[in-house]
Amino acid sequence: MAPKLLLHGCCAHCTAYSFKYWQEQGFAVSVYWYNPNIHPFMEHQSRLEAMRKLSAEMGFELITEPSYHMAEYFKNVSANVDGRCRICFDMRLGQTAAYAAGHGYEYFSSSLFISPHQKHQDAVCSAEALAKETGVRFAYADLRKRYSDSRHITKPLDLYRQQYCGCVYSEYERFGKPNSPA
């Protein structure tokens, strides 16, 4: 029987190749959606709907966290805006590892590790610490060189494609005026 891996899905585009990769490595993969960093709420819903479509297309089990946890996210990151990415990784991967521990998964990972736009090493450090804390093994692969492969999988599916990481800070960094105050 294949070992069970819970893959945190940050978005449909990054999840597509990540799911395929871990499945090819011999894991029974389920995808977990928990992303309280994505704002505004309708952006979160658009990305979740894209993930549901991808799940139907690729045939994976999609587990969604029923609570959005927006207030908790802002409470955690507002105290340390410069360190927000690590805090965000701790929240999302922490929830994933905890779910994995409570539901019989031997491993966890994330589609974050395919994105060239994430603070990769911070995400790795977060996942490694959470593996020690929860006892669930962290399955790691640096998939950043395969990012375009994921896009090739999802482009024909005409899924919603986001323009920023998800948080309002990244949205401002992407679209805000260069000299305007934050």
From Swiss-Prot:
Pfam families: QueH (PF02677). It comes from the Bacteria. Keywords: 4Fe-4S, Disulfide bond, Iron, Iron-sulfur, Metal-binding, Oxidoreductase, Queuosine biosynthesis, Redox-active center, tRNA processing. Disulfide bonds join C165-C167. Pathway: tRNA modification; tRNA-queuosine biosynthesis. The keyword Iron-sulfur applies. InterPro entries: QueH. [4Fe-4S] cluster binds at C10, C11, C85, C88. Its EC number is 1.17.99.6. One of its GO terms (biological process) is tRNA modification. It catalyses: epoxyqueuosine(34) in tRNA + AH2 = queuosine(34) in tRNA + A + H2O. It is an enzyme of class 1 (oxidoreductase). One of its GO terms (molecular function) is epoxyqueuosine reductase activity. Catalyzes the conversion of epoxyqueuosine (oQ) to queuosine (Q), which is a hypermodified base found in the wobble positions of tRNA(Asp), tRNA(Asn), tRNA(His) and tRNA(Tyr). Belongs to the QueH family. This is Epoxyqueuosine reductase QueH.
